[in-house]
Amino acid sequence: VSMKQRISIICTIVMMVLLVFGCGPKQLGNTGATHQVTDGTGTVVTVPSEPKRVVPIAASTEDIVLSLVDPSRVAAVGTVPNNVPDASAKVEKHVKASAESMLSVQPDLVLVPNWMSPDAIGEMRNMQIPVYVYKTPTTVQEAKATIHEIAGLLHASDASMIASMDADLKTVEELANKYSSERPLVAFYSQFGLTGGKGSTFDDMCNYLKVNNVAA
């Protein structure tokens, strides 16, 4: 395997961590049909014990949810393409990340990353829509924790998804070890003008790939 192939794997693994993402949500109380949890912002949210009308907001959230549960439990997805098109095709409704759009599908749980506008989240909560905000992961370990967190909310198993991630990471590390004496300089720049600086997901993946991040 060439050095060029090794470096190209960065993009694949970075996208895996960005698009999928420890401890589960803190349980506060259980009434049978619902229970209270504390989300990533410290807000106490009442959620169903086994949500059946989930709306994941953002393509990355859709990737996680549709990899964990059957599409029949997903009330709607967004309008931006994700990485699970076959599962998404089985979800009939498409919505925007607004309170009005959410009301049209009557979700019993909306999952959103913490980069979403607090105002939009507040509007949904004001309409009595249960919204759980999770912290966007920036490292592989945080990604695993986020998957575990969401799986707990959905009353689903994350074992298969985590095992798949571990297998991919093992392949990458085995490949990187073949060139352990070399530390090429690499950089990440997205179409949105984002760079993978110190503390970013890209920076974390550079450690697995045994390369040096120029922007760190």
Residue map of PLM features:
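Short beta-strand->loop
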Residues: 111-114, 133-137, 154, 187-199
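Alpha-helical, coiled-coil/dimerization segments enriched in small aliphatic residues
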Residues: 78-83, 198-216
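A short, structured surface patch at a secondary-structure boundary
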Residues: 53-105, 109-114
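Charged, glycine-enriched surface loops/patches
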Residues: 119-159
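Bacterial Sec-exported substrate-binding components of ABC uptake systems
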Residues: 6, 21-60, 156-186
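Bacterial N-terminal signal peptides
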Residues: 11-20
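Short, structured coil segments at secondary-structure junctions
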Residues: 70, 127-129, 209
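Bacterial N-terminal signal peptides that target proteins for export
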Residues: 2-11
